[in-house]
Structures are given as structure tokens and as C-alpha cells.
Amino acid sequence: MKSASTLSSAFLQPAGQTLPASLLALRFDRASALADLVLPSRKTENWKYSAKHLKLTDDMASTLPLDASVETATDMSGYTIVLVNGVVRPQASSYPTLEGLSVQRFRDLSEDDATLAADLMKKSISDQPAKAGSVNLSLLNGARFEDGLLIQLQPGTVVDQPLFVIHHTTANHSGSAYPCILVAAGNNSQL
């Protein structure tokens, strides 16, 4: 009998280490859970009629270049936050400095804010009980993110224009990016 395929060990290698301690610990926990993840096949009920099986090859495990250049749209009506290959680009972003609004990259978070971000991520779909026959690949995002974005709105805060989060992913070569965006909105806030 053929053994069930599991995720390549290349996906289990640690990513960058520039995050606060609580986010690094969360990422380590998620990566540990991936070690035993059995990948779906055509015999998996939810994948039964899939034309192709899931191929997560070693070259896809590599992180896309963090210094990739992209052109940003300037004709948008509103505020923008730009992520390139899963990493926030403050210099390409345009968002307000407004009392009651906090927009921070994960790597710039204080330990208290990093703990809030980790707690929000722990409430994600990856911590929900899996349905019989389902495969939870959301653990992959929690194990591989390099950076992320925490948007916090205090109660009653109103942002006067839309806030667009723009993801750019370069496709020069194989690899992957794992953007992570968390919004903590207080009562009666508007974004």
C-alpha cells in the first residue's frame, strides 16, 4: 500500500527571524503542526473530483524576494497599504495619521501588540475543529509568514476614506508569499 504524502520538509524550515517573540512562537507552533499534515489526494472526499492533486514542491517553499520592485497605482481614491511578496512596504503606502487608528507592520510591533496579533491569529480557521475528510492548509500561512499588518481602530474611530490593502506578488520564479492582515476594530468604528 502506498503511504500518504506529507508536506515537504522544505516547508518546515524556519522563515526570517525579525518578528517579535510571541509571533515567532506562534509561527513555530504552526510549523510543528505541519510536520504531521497529510496532504489530500483524489481519495480525499473534498478533493475527489479535482482534476489535479496538490503539488507543493520544494521550489515553492522558498520565499519570494523581499526586495522585489513593483509599480503602485496612484489613481486610487482612498488610502493604500502595499504588500509585496507578503511584506508591508511603508514607502509605497499612503494611509492617514489619525487619532484612534494604528497601522503597524508585525516586525515593528511592541510585545503587547504582538501578543494581540498572536491571539487574533490563534482564533483563525486553523484552530477550528477539522471536518471529517477535510484538510486544513491554513496552518501553512501561520507557519510561513514573514511579516504582516495589524490595523487597530479604537472605539468610535471613523476613517474618512476607504483603506485599500494591495497585494503584489512577483512571478519571476517559483516561491511563495504568505501575507497576513489582522484588523482589530473597536465598537462603532468605521473603516
Give the role of each language-model region:
Residues 1-191:
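Glycine-rich and polybasic anion-binding loops at the starts of cofactor/ligand-binding domains
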